[in-house]
């Protein structure tokens, strides 16, 4: 698998090699729901960060342009609220024919981001295939509109 899968340990955004603020709403080891570049949660609501620090991040396009990353075939994005920024920072890479499919977490309650994600992917000639989430989310009002959407390239 190590020759087929590459995990980016740099936070991704729409900015090229920038130090942006990582905002943590609470400090729990291994916790998600942090936000990079802005203090908003997975629904776009502002929160007061209990911990903040600058961290170097970049865009997908910077990684491919500088040959740090080869153009991927499949992409998975799950970042709790800045998915659209990552897509914006990867537009050139996502136009590449090598990219076949994207799985992206979408919160349908975060309407502006939901619309932005769909618009960007449509512009890049991606077609919606399906959306899924764990059955347990159906009973959880907080996450019942959060899905992993899968798109494929036309």
Specify the residue positions occupied by each region the protein language model found:
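Phosphate/nucleotide-binding beta-alpha loop and adjacent structural elements of enzyme active sites
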Residues: 1-154
